[in-house]
Amino acid sequence: MAFPAPAFSLANLLNGSYGVDTPEEVERVRSEQREEAAAACRNYRPLPAVDVSESVPEDAHSLRTPDGAPSEEVSVEFVTYGAEDYLEKSDDELLVAFETMVKPMRIGQLWCPAFNKCSFISSIAMARALLLAPRTSHRTMKCFEDLVAAIYTKSDFYYDDECEADDVQIDISSRDVPGYSFEPWSRTSGFEPPPICEACDMIMYQCPCFDFNALKKSCAERTFADDYVIEGLDGVVDNATLLSNLGPFLVPVKCQYEKCPTPTVANPPSLNRATDRVDINLVQSICDSTLPTHSNYDDSFHQVFVESADYSIDLDHVRLRQSDLIAKIPDSGHMIPVLNTGSGHKRVGTTKEVLTAIKKRNADVPELGDSVNLSRLSKAVAERFFISYINGNSLASSNFVNVVSNFHDYMEKWKSSGLSYDDLPDLHAENLQFYDHMIKSDVKPVVSDTLNIDRPVPATITYHKKGITSQFSPLFTALFERFQRCLRERIILPVGKISSLEMAGFDVKNKHCLEIDLSKFDKSQGEFHLMIQEHILNGLGCPAPITKWWCDFHRFSYIRDRRAGVGMPISFQRRTGDAFTYFGNTIVTMAEFAWCYDTDQFEKLLFSGDDSLGFSVLPPVGDPSKFTTLFNMEAKVMEPAVPYICSKFLLSDEFGNTFSVPDPLREVQRLGTKKIPYSDNDEFLFAHFMSFVDRLKFLDRMTQSCIDQLSLFFELKYRKSGAEAALMLGAFKKYTANFQSYKELYYSDRRQCELINSFSCVELRIERSSSTKQRKKKDGIERRRDDKRRTPTGSYGGGEEAETKVSQAESTGTRSQKSQREGAFKSQAVPLPTILSSRWFGTDRDVPPCEHGGIVRV
């Protein structure tokens, strides 16, 4: 008994039940096809003519002669099949026919109307039936292609009376329909013939021209939208929805996303490994051997040298205003680290320091790119971006929500800083081309051995005020969330609620890595990068007026540092502190990467700002020189490449899951930071401890296999001993155990002052002779009666007596640490023979103690 062959479908194709393996079966299939075609020709009978009331003129569209026999070969360019044949067409062929007949309008990456295979084929069948039906109206019916479009868009089937068509419309009311021929057709069996390759004349999926693995991966690829569903919508209605600064597209709803529950599996056993006991001397020795130029680094007076030395700099179009500089406000001191890891002090934004930072971060823009057609090439780069990263169906079905909800969250976040709805400015009345400028007081730690010859330059921040940022940030936040939901599954942006560097079921071992280091990223961006961002934002669904408005005031801007009195014009380059900084840097990096490399060769791609990392089975192939010649970037392909991104190493455990580990070298440097403010109850130090514990929560997952991976990656990246990285993990395990262990890393000299001043009590009374006033006048020293400062102890003659009272609050709260220490030692030097108290006419005066007869009450 012969069993029918399996029907051709994607499911049968993927599970392996479809296909012809032997040449004999191929020949049998072809012979059956020839017999069926011959039988169809023998059984052909023309259908009887239909009697209609109106005659049909013969023209080029007629497909048959009056006797019903085919007269010539029919053109198959557009519409030459019946509805049944359209079912056998591929999706690409249906898209071509859809564009030809319906003529949809393209809006970014979306079509209006959207393509629906079932609706399109049904419209073709209905149009054929309408053209064959008898006429009941005197109006002229549309031609076949226009009729299909009218049925699909649910519009009128007839031409307007006042409008004449460009072509001569033909009133067709017979069975001779353009693109359709009445021929008997029936399938003899359920067998569907396989497709034949045109190149090698073999059954497809067996020929070398076909890549079955690529088809299987493309069909099985998922997006984040498949795992994250909309859980609920919460309405937000108040006065904030009346704001019109962002236009009418604000949607007053809040969309909450929750990851779909993962299947229940057995929990992996705990693989904690005990670490050796370490002390602070061992950690310092690790720093000395790993960072040889950092152990003796001390920048306490480096900025003093810069401010007091001669200064020469070359800048264009810089405006200096030294008349209204803002004085530095002294802080209350910082904790002193025990470890010396090369960490620097806080930088003060003086004029020279700001000019040095602007010279490095904003001025001297590189010009490495070639001359190109910006308009044409920017569109091509944007199209490549969507093809490489975006799932078009998810983008079309995704909602653009959460704008107003994000706006409320932003306002609540900065409510404590004085930001309110009433203080929001009118964006049309603001000059958005003016940006504020400042330098980062915290300098990023340096991992290279260059601290003995090079002084790190602080980074700069160019930003708008919160009132302006609060109106753009909600829009770009919602757009970024939609962008994440439409990404393909192999694309990862490790930021937000739905994405991280934790990758279940993916192993980084035995993979080729590709890491591109882009230096001078912010100031290297020009008009070409801005046009790419504009096309991508429009394609993602950002309102076109907002996109154009945003790009217009980024073409030419002016930055000004009010504290340093420095101003400078800039063009196109990235503003490091506005609402679009991270989003813009990420899409620029992704667009450049997609243009230089074929993204289909990578199993995983990770992007975050200007950082990128790719994993592939085979060595990646591409042209990294285009980063420089086309995109004006100083790019360097890291060799040897290791799984390293966002200052974190990626490791895989024994269960095939990947997790991130912060760079041990940078974490050791953070243990010696000099930026923790002093507080009496150690609240700032405890906040740093909790942040340290959160970053090192991976320690419980570090098995011996993971430690070996980290040691290998550490040695490949830094050319340093990998055994040092394992010792650093032991130190991290100790100092994350409890807060008391962490407190061993810092101390403050203010505690010594508190011990010295511990004998002070409520009031301090000192008696002196009245002749001191005459002696002061004689020496030319005059003091006011209401002067609250303490006069140093000296030798004075006897006479009238007075007393002074200095409260404990004044002595400890309003004086500096130095004056506290000096006052404590001088008070301790005064003899304490007795305790006396005297008043002079009920008044208290600030007078110095006398050398003879001075009595202090404690």
UniProtKB/Swiss-Prot annotation:
Residues 805-817 have a biased composition (Polar residues). GO terms for molecular function: nucleotide binding; RNA binding; RNA-directed RNA polymerase activity. One of its GO terms (biological process) is DNA-templated transcription. It catalyses: RNA(n) + a ribonucleoside 5'-triphosphate = RNA(n+1) + diphosphate. Residues 511-624 form the RdRp catalytic domain. Pfam families: RdRP_2. InterPro entries: Bromoviridae_RdRp, DNA/RNA_pol_sf, RNA-dep_RNA_pol_alsuvir, RNA-dir_pol_PSvirus. Keywords: Nucleotide-binding, Nucleotidyltransferase, RNA-directed RNA polymerase, Transferase, Viral RNA replication. It is an enzyme of class 2 (transferase). Its EC number is 2.7.7.48. CDD domains: Bromoviridae_RdRp. Belongs to the ssRNA positive-strand viruses RNA-directed RNA polymerase family. Interacts with replication protein 1a. RNA-dependent RNA polymerase which replicates the viral genome composed of 3 RNA segments, RNA1, RNA2 and RNA3. This is RNA-directed RNA polymerase 2a. It comes from Cucumber mosaic virus (strain K).
